[in-house]
């Protein structure tokens, strides 16, 4: 609209007013599943198996004001919305020690500009080990992306999609907790 543009005496644009507009409609549906099972043995300790799985069935918005709803589930129309996402883990606790192996999964999704192309699914493994030094002190060693897996290529995001993957690759940290 002409009132959204300000020009100088020579006709050059000096200000462009861009305002967000409420599209007013969004339909979202999905399924979340969370399972957890704990096994205890007096000699071996505790083993906890856990799994969380999410499936986006529909994520629909209009592409422009007055347009019909477009389903963006499994695409990056409205930001990256993979249909599948999951985290599974196994935690073993024995005495003052505990260790967890975690598998993180993000499903593939189609490119909004080229629906015949997609960003590949991505999964990583993380390992965490903790030692309860005293009732007040705990030391934890964490390795994220244990296999140093690279984020999948996404040409629409200048290389990779930072909302779905971490560019750092393998990352280790040491955490010390002390409760006063």
Give residue spans per PLM region.
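Flexible, surface-exposed loop regions and adjacent strand-edge segments
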Residues: 1, 65-72, 107, 116-120, ...
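Gram-negative outer-membrane beta-barrel transporters
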Residues: 1-109
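Asparagine-centered polar/low-complexity signal
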Residues: 21-23, 115, 145-148
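A short, compositionally biased micro-patch
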Residues: 26, 93, 122, 132-134, ...
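A cross-taxa feature marking solvent-exposed loop/turn segments within ectodomains of secreted
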Residues: 42-44, 120, 134
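C-terminal beta-signal and adjacent terminal beta-strands/loops
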Residues: 57-60, 103-111, 130-180
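Generic long, charged, amphipathic alpha-helical segments
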Residues: 100-105, 112-128
């Amino acid at each position: 609209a002409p009132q959204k543009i300000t020009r100088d005496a020579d006709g050059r644009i000096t200000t462009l007013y861009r305002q967000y507009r409420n599209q007013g409609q969004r339909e979202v549906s999905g399924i979340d599943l969370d399972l957890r099972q704990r096994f205890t043995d007096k000699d071996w300790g505790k083993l906890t198996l856990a799994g969380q799985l999410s499936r986006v069935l529909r994520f629909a918005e209009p592409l422009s004001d007055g347009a019909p709803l477009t389903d963006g589930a499994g695409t990056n129309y409205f930001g990256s919305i993979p249909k599948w996402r999951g985290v599974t883990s196994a935690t073993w606790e024995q005495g003052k020690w505990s260790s967890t192996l975690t598998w993180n999964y993000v499903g593939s999704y189609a490119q909004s500009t080229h629906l015949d192309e997609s960003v590949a699914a991505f999964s990583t493994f993380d390992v965490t080990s903790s030692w309860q030094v005293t009732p007040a002190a705990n030391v934890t060693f964490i390795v994220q992306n244990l296999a140093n897996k690279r984020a999948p290529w996404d040409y629409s995001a200048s290389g990779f999609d930072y909302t779905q993957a971490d560019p750092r690759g393998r990352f280790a940290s040491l955490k010390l907790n002390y409760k006063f």
